[in-house]
Structure formats: C-alpha cells, structure tokens
Amino acid sequence: MQLPVQLSSPLALAVLSIATCQLALVWWYQRKRTNPLPPGPSALPFLGNAHQIPLQYPERIFSQWARTYGGVMYLRLFKKSVLILDSVKAAQDLMDKRGAKFSDRPQLTLITDVFAFKPMMFTMPYGDLWRRHRKWYQASLESKAALDTYNAVQEMETCTLLSALVSDSEHFADQVKRFTGAILLEIVYGHAVTSVKDDLIRLSDEMMTQAVSAGSLVATLLDFFPFLMHIPEWFPGGGFKREGARVRHLMRQLLDVPFNEVQQAMLEGSGKACLTTYMLEEQAEHGDLTPDDVDNIKGAATLLFIAGTDTTITTLLTFFLAMVLHPEVVHKAQAEIDRVVGRTRLPSLMDRDALPYLDQVLKEVYRWNPPVPLGIPHQVRDDDVYNGRHIPGGSMVVSNIWSMSRDPDTYEDADRFWPERYEGKSSDELARSDPRRIVYGFGRRLCPGRFLADSSIWLAAARVIATLDIRKVLDAEGKEMTPSAEFISGAVSHPKPFSLDILPRDEVAAKLIAQLDPNHLFSVQGEAI
C-alpha cells in the first residue's frame, strides 16, 4: 500500500517541518512551565527591578535578598534578565562546570563604544578572538617558567618600595601605585620606571579616574538602551559623551605610546624581552602584521597593565589599612618571619610555604575587601536549567563575590579582620575557605594575571612586615588617629583615603633597608633621595 504523498515531496517535507516546529514550541513552553525562573523580588512593568537596586554598594542589597531568595536569584533590569549568584557552589556549578554556556560577556556599551576599551579580552564575547588573547596571556602569565622570569623585577621593586615608604610615608598610596605600575610596565613593555611621576603611570591613573567619574548609572542606561549613544552632547544627559571623549583620548595614548616605543626599540635592535615583544614575534610567525593584529596586541598589553594595576593597588592599600588597625597581627607575622627567615635578609618568594601565618594574613586581606565585589558579569549563551529552575539564554550573570566572602557558614564573624580563622582546618576546609578561589573570578573568564598579582602582593607584604612598623598618625595633641575601615563603592572597591606612619622596626631593619640601592629611592616629587 502506498502513502498518498511521498515523504520526499515538498509538501510532505513542509508538513513534517511545521509539525516538528509545533512540537518544539510545545516542548519549549512546557519546559518553561515545568521549570520556573529562580526566585527574586517582585518586578515592575518596564523597570523590572531597576528601581530596587541602589547605585552605591549594590552587592549589599543583593546579599540581603539572598537571605530570602537563596543563592541564585532572578532579576529583570528593564528588558534584560539578570542572574545574581550569591553562592560559591552555584558560581562553580554554572561558570566552572558549564563554561561553554556561561562564558560569554554582555554588551558593555560605555566601556567599549564610548571609552574605546577595545579590543580587550574582558569585553569580548566568547569566541575565537577571545581565545587568541587568552592564549597570549596563558603563555606569559600562567606557566611557572614564565612567572619565574618575573621574580627579579618583583624583588627589585619591593626593595624600592621599602626605601620609598621609609623616606615618604605620607604619600604611601603613591608609592604603592608606583610599585605596582613599575612591575607591570617592565613585564608588559620592558619599560623601567624611574619616577613616581612616570608618564605611563600618571596616564593610567588619570584615565581610570576619568572613567570612574562617568558613573555607573550612565553605564547601566547605555547597556540597556544603546540608542542613547545617538543623542547629541548638548542634549540633557548627553554629557557622558564629553567625558567619554576625554577617557578615549587618554586610552588612545595608553594603547599607542608604549607599544610604539617597543616596536621602535625592536627595529633598532634594542628591544627588551616583554609581553609585547612576545606577541609581536609570535604573530609575525604567521605572516606580516595586519592593522587588526596590531590593534589586538595593543589591546592585550594595555589591558594587563591597567587592570592589573588597579586591582593590585586596592589589595595592597587594604593590606596597609588592616595592618594599621591590627598591630597584633603585624607583630605575630613579624615573629614568624624572624623565626623562619632571620633578620639578616629580606623574605623571598622561596620562603612562602614556610610562612603559613603570613599566608593567612593575605587570605584575610582578600576576603575582607574583595577588589572587584561583583566581578565582571558573564552572559548565558543558551537556555539552561539549574536545580529545577529555568535560566533564560542571554541572561547577564553577576557573581556577588563580596557576599560570598562573608558567607556565615564559611566565615564566622565575617566583618572582623581575623587571620586566625584559617587555623586548625582540614585541607578540604582550607581549600573551601581560601578567598583566592573567588576573588579572581570563575570559569573560563578567570583572571589570567592572578598568579603574578598574588606573588607581587605576597612579596610586598612579607618585606613590609619584616622590616617596618605601621603606626597610626598622631594628632596635634599627640593622640592616635584611628582610620575607618570603609571602602568606596564601585566596580573596584578601594579603601577610603586614610593616613598612617611608617618607620623601620628597629636599627637592624634600618640598616637592612639602608643597604638597598639609593638610586631606587623616590619621593612623591619623583626625585632621587
């Protein structure tokens, strides 16, 4: 018996296609019906939950909501679905274990289109270009062999930092900026910093200050309403274009100036080995450099410099704030260093495993003030289901790292700075409570410079504690002025400005510091002492 219509006919194929689509739609709607969205606060038409999220310290309101709705919350910002992850387990389950779906990046209009932070890996969608940049970073920043080559500049710059802090403790924050920038500029461009007023450090600092001043509200509105890009500067609300032009001009200089210096040095045969020369040489193996190749190398180099500088600075400033508030921690760490290292030399990275209490201090610095409290948002590529809840494709995914660092099940009395919380724990408990597993991000978007940053921070902290006393400043009546443990709201959480006094611990430490090369001592005016 023959069928009335052959399955190979156009009509049969059309009917079959329509039926398949109908079944797919039924399945999709059924799945949405059987898998509800994650819980979250009630939303309004059009606004969604935008009216409930403060511009200042949004991580804190998310943390409060998590007590009601759990570690995975669904919000809507205008038309955009947003997933807030307040749980380390959820962040690891989704971004670590389902990286193929959860590694995309949402549109960051202010950063990419107004400020021209491109092409840079942290703004790129997950794809081939992202993998190209990631490969460069992995080769230069994630292998032990590569990291070992940076030890010399880290050792030298920590010596410079000690001398500078003793000679000019009033401007300790500027010395921290110089220290951090000097390491990264040497690694990225082979550029030696000889002054606190180094042009590239000044340029980066000015650019970041201008970018932050543009405000998070503008960034949010542009991301959700990109048509606002087309309003004229003179129109109410169009001022972001003027501010953006200033940032863009500074960014253009950061992209071009150091790169051109490296390229010129290579042509003259005087180029130093650095990340930029590596990328240029690696790309040249595949043929002549195209304008796109040059732009990508510039973007990769500039991103490592500016992103690594800002987050490392805030971690070291948090360290100084914690130490001036907790002299008992300094004294305990000094006793450990004295016992293990002695007083005749400075600690080195080789000593790290033998100094467990110092490692606890640094863990607590990371936890007490995570540098990037909400991380950098990911985006879901396709629909997914987690714990029976539907996650719409295209959702923005925000990790509340600040709240994770205060999980009461892991960190007792979480607002307290207390390095001893890591003592007496099993290896599993230590791994679970180590804040470094969260502060550098998750999954395939994990910060590629985390090992370099962590070793630079550790070495600076170890040598500061070994040789210096960090004291409260005295007022006119000779009374100690205690700084407030407060942090500025923003994408990067900096301590609010504070003062301290820094002196050598004793004559032994003073003599050790005095042996350092005097040509590496800088005042805030940038002149050799």
From Swiss-Prot:
Its cofactor is heme. GO terms for molecular function: heme binding; iron ion binding; monooxygenase activity; oxidoreductase activity, acting on paired donors, with incorporation or reduction of molecular oxygen. Cytochrome P450 monooxygenase that is able to use delta(6)-protoilludene as a substrate to produce delta(6)-protoilludene-5-ol. Its EC number is 1.-.-.-. Signal peptide: none annotated. It is an enzyme of class 1 (oxidoreductase). The gene is CYP136. One of its GO terms (cellular component) is membrane. It is found in: Membrane. The chain crosses the membrane at residues 9-29. Pathway: Secondary metabolite biosynthesis. Heme binds at C447. This is Cytochrome P450 monooxygenase 136. InterPro entries: Cyt_P450, Cyt_P450_E_grp-I, Cyt_P450_sf, Cytochrome_P450_fung. Keywords: Heme, Iron, Membrane, Metal-binding, Monooxygenase, Oxidoreductase, Transmembrane, Transmembrane helix. Its main location: membrane. Belongs to the cytochrome P450 family. It is a single-pass membrane protein.
